[in-house]
Swiss-Prot record:
Species assigned in the record: Rickettsia prowazekii (strain Madrid E)
Gene Ontology MF: a single term: 3-octaprenyl-4-hydroxybenzoate carboxy-lyase activity
Protein name according to UniProt: Uncharacterized protein RP821
Cellular component aspect of the GO annotation: cytosol
Record-linked Gene3D superfamilies: Single helix bin, UbiD C-terminal domain-like
Any GO BP: ubiquinone biosynthetic process
Similarity field: Belongs to the UbiD family.
Pfam family, one: UbiD_C
Length: 492
């Protein structure tokens, strides 16, 4: 089932026991975070806070929803998928879009045509009026929004689920519409800080704009959108596909866009709230500290100022929010879903990969365990180097553990057993120095530059070892089958 907008999605979730209304008065300052954190830890529903007190002590006229994507089930519902198993099918589609294979026959060519036609037919549709323009405020005050302060030492309230819409300075494909989710620190009534990492789409547009244009860089921030738009913004979509097109493909319906009121950008017409404005090319301010997905407060660093020129919204909007902290948190759960999407993409490039796992406690991407069908000496190291260099999302990975296909990568007991029995610390550990690292990683020797470690925990073959390799203990299948047939009668 696809949804037109966020309220329609919430209505469906509530009907199916996946949303809980909170009528008790709560504060945006810390209280929403603590309630959301406890419910998420219990595997609970999305939360709709109907009576919210803002940072200035006034009551918000806008309700707040949190934990919306804090379960794989809700993510699948939002992506218009029937089950988590279909996440890999979605990954297979992305793998095809990223690197289409040449058809081997006329029949195969015919089978691909409907998919290609469907992709290109999902270009967004511009309409004259949108629900997000029911209220237009041209003298904007950000403080009308119930923006969360997530952690005690956060320097200010923080917009956490804003979809930032940008375009580059040219008509080249690389400058087409980009959707990205970046946190934004509140600085004043009409100013925010745009915290985007250097290699993200919005930051790349901003960088190219500096070299091509003299005028300010327009950007729009969408808060509360159709779930396929939100999830398209966090999915590893190939650069040759627009997030708007991909969202239309997910929802099986063209995304309706509307022209912004004060800037030359188009945004989803059924958005709850939109902040229009310009990102400065020269003015930067210190951002942070804020609690982050690592479970620590991040360092202070300068980011460009986003000046809001208008706030547009529905008559009765809903404010979508989240928090980030030590896993489990909402980004970690989204990471679990994205993990399933990554597997077919990786398998297309490395067919020997059997399974791939970003443990949530590894802070989204810092630790990965991968199993392979090993077929030659040095195979594990080739996989390490391949993963580190293949996708931009893996650039900041610090630790890769490679195991054989008899090991369940999602079971730490098996992974640790493989490391303990199949690896030698000197022979089977590889290091790479002076490699790109997430600048938020304070454990690295230099900001943005650190090392990577790979552990080969696979069975060894000549010439990796000259010793006789151990034989794995396994019960005979005949005995297993016999005991299976006897089991109920044993009354154990």
């Amino acid at each position: 089932m696809s949804f037109r907008d966020l309220p329609e999605f919430l209505k469906f979730l509530e009907k199916n026991g996946q949303l809980k209304r909170i009528s008790t008065t709560v504060k945006t300052d810390l209280e929403i975070t603590e309630i959301s954190r406890r419910v998420l830890a219990q595997g609970g529903p999305a939360l709709l806070f109907e009576n919210v007190i803002k940072a200035d002590g006034s009551k918000s006229t806008i309700p707040v929803v949190t934990n919306l994507y804090a379960s794989i089930k809700r993510i699948c519902i939002g992506l218009n998928l029937k089950s988590p198993a279909e996440l890999r099918e979605l990954g297979a589609l992305l793998a095809f879009l990223k690197q289409p294979q040449i058809p081997e026959s006329f029949k195969e060519t015919l089978s691909i045509l409907p998919l290609a036609k469907r992709i290109f037919s999902m270009s967004p549709k511009t309409i004259a009026k949108g629900a997000c323009h029911e209220v237009v405020i041209v003298k904007p005050n950000i403080n009308i929004l119930p923006i969360q302060k997530c952690w005690p030492e956060d320097i200010s309230p923080l917009i956490t689920w804003g979809i930032v819409v940008t375009k580059g300075p040219t008509k080249d494909r690389v400058d087409h519409y980009n959707l990205g989710i970046y946190r934004m620190q509140v600085v004043s009534e009409n100013k925010l800080l745009m915290r985007w990492l250097k290699l993200r789409g919005g930051a790349e547009h901003h960088k190219r704009w500096k070299t091509k244009k003299k005028e300010l860089f327009p950007a729009a921030v969408v808060i509360g959108a159709n779930p396929v738009i939100t999830l398209a913004a966090v999915t590893p979509i190939p650069e040759n596909v627009s997030e708007y097109n991909f969202a239309g493909l997910l929802g099986n319906k063209k995304i309706e866009l509307v022209q912004c009121k004060t800037i030359d950008l188009k945004v989803p017409a059924h958005s709850e709230i939109v902040l229009e404005g310009y990102v400065s090319l020269a003015e930067y301010l210190p951002e942070g500290p804020f609690g982050d997905h690592t479970g620590y407060y991040n360092d202070v660093e300068e980011f460009p100022i986003f000046t809001v020129t208008a706030i547009t919204m529905k008559k009765k909007p809903i404010y979508l929010s989240t928090y980030t902290g030590k896993p489990p948190d909402e980004p970690a759960i989204l990471g679990e879903a994205l993990n399933e999407i990554f597997i077919p993409i990786l398998h297309q490039q490395f067919p020997e990969i059997v399974d791939f796992w970003f443990p949530p406690e590894g802070c989204s991407y810092r630790v990965v365990v991968v199993s392979i069908k090993k077929s030659y000496p040095g195979h594990a190291k080739r996989i390490m180097l391949g993963i580190w260099s293949y996708l931009r999302q893996f650039m900041y990975n610090k630790f890769i553990i490679v195991v054989d296909d008899d090991i369940d990568v999602r079971n730490w007991q098996e992974v640790i057993w493989a490391i303990a029995t199949r690896s030698d610390p000197k022979r089977d550990t590889s290091f790479i120095d002076n490699s790109p690292i997430d600048y938020l990683d304070f454990a690295s020797p230099k900001s943005g530059l650190g090392s990577k470690m790979g552990i080969d925990a696979t069975d060894k073959m000549y010439p990796e070892t000259n010793r006789k390799w151990g034989k794995k203990i396994e019960m005979s299948q005949e005995v297993i089958d016999k005991i299976d047939s006897m089991w109920d009668g044993l009354n154990i």
